[in-house]
Amino acid sequence: MAFKLWERFSQADNVFQALRPLTFISLLGLAPFRLNLNPRKEVQTSKFSFFAGIVHFLFFVLCFGISVKEGDSIIGYFFQTNITRFSDGTLRLTGILAMSTIFGFAMFKRQRLVSIIQNNIVVDEIFVRLGMKLDYRRILLSSFLISLGMLLFNVIYLCVSYSLLVSATISPSFVTFTTFALPHINISLMVFKFLCTTDLARSRFSMLNEILQDILDAHIEQLSALELSPMHSVVNHRRYSHRLRNLISTPMKRYSVTSVIRLNPEYAIKQVSNIHNLLCDICQTIEEYFTYPLLGIIAISFLFILFDDFYILEAILNPKRLDVFEADEFFAFFLMQLIWYIVIIVLIVEGSSRTILHSSYTAAIVHKILNITDDPELRDRLFRLSLQLSHRKVLFTAAGLFRLDRTLIFTITGAATCYLIILIQFRFTHHMDDTSSNSTNNLHSIHLGD
């Protein structure tokens, strides 16, 4: 019975079924669209999800307002200093701005998310004309594993965080802990949505590269170009040894799914140009839809990483601020929070970097084909595609301020280290001023006593 249920759930023959995990978050209002499995296969906005998003955001604002009015915060339960009060206020401000941006773009820019899915459907139809079909089941399982992993990650994180607070004899109110938990949940859902959409683009870039690689393999076989470097196989280098053995013995078998591509490469290159153009439009729409929410998420993640590091160093440098019984819980709580935000940034960076990496393979394969073929019509198509590749490059940014690639990790590390040193210097300067003030008051008291 369980096996049949799993087989039924894991079945995916189109992009709609592959996006089932993404539609689950529509109940929270962060994906206000619905998929119609009718013959027309339409993607429509959902009024229910739009209403759920408004209710969700108003509930967060209510909890946030009550916690601010009562002056409760998680860090305030441990210790209070001028810097912690400043950091707490900064995190509150960035938190409400980030949540407003996330819900605002999710609800009022939802048509862009719908256009992303619709353009993916058009791309899949072009692939079918070329005799290719995406592995929708793999996409479904990939998104399902990502959603399950993020769900378990957040459940464990929030449960352990609450347990650490309770074990430290801290009992946060429902409003305070809800204000703490909801941003984590919403950030995770937005990042999950970003990973799903970038994976849709990445998988299609990968399929596009396979088409070009098949054209390249066909030319290598026809010309018996054994002198070419094994690196000519861009999609999968291991295929070269198998291709070499076939060239020595018998030609490689041409499968029916690639017959259109090999028999009419000019038509295939023309369709590849159309697919690449649509994929660039998809990636541009992804950037426009996620640019400000991701900017808010990265900004608040950077601040949490910075201040969590400072809290831990503050407790190490001045252990008297913490009771002996709550010191272990303090370190564990803020270390877990630090790791959580680092994981979020890594997921964003990897989701965009993998898509950019697969899109960059296309230009390499195109120029490898140009170096081999002498067909004037095919070369003309390839030159046009090469020009398109040079002008339409995939790039993800956060409102154009910085790129969402692996260089962002190095940038955040350097900036956090710099500001952490400044905070430590400010802390020591403030501590020295307090010490000198106390010494002056003591000397003045002694002088008056005399």
From Swiss-Prot:
In addition to expression in a large number of taste neurons, Gr28a is also expressed in a few nonchemosensory neurons, including the campaniform sensilla of the wing, leg stretch receptors, and multiple dendritic (MD) neurons in the abdomen. In larvea, is expressed in neurons of the terminal external chemosensory organ, the dorsal external chemosensory organ, as well as in the ventral and posterior pharyngeal sense organ. It comes from the Eukaryota. The keyword Glycoprotein applies. Belongs to the insect chemoreceptor superfamily. Gustatory receptor (GR) family. Gr2a subfamily. GO terms for biological process: chemosensory behavior; male courtship behavior; monoatomic ion transmembrane transport; sensory perception of taste; signal transduction. GO terms for molecular function: ligand-gated monoatomic ion channel activity; taste receptor activity. GO terms for cellular component: axon; dendrite; membrane; neuronal cell body; plasma membrane. It is found in: Cell membrane. It is a multi-pass membrane protein. This is Putative gustatory receptor 28a. Residues 69-87, 160-171, 314-329, 425-450 are extracellular. Glycans are attached at N82, N438. Keywords: Cell membrane, Glycoprotein, Membrane, Receptor, Transducer, Transmembrane, Transmembrane helix. It comes from Drosophila melanogaster (Fruit fly).
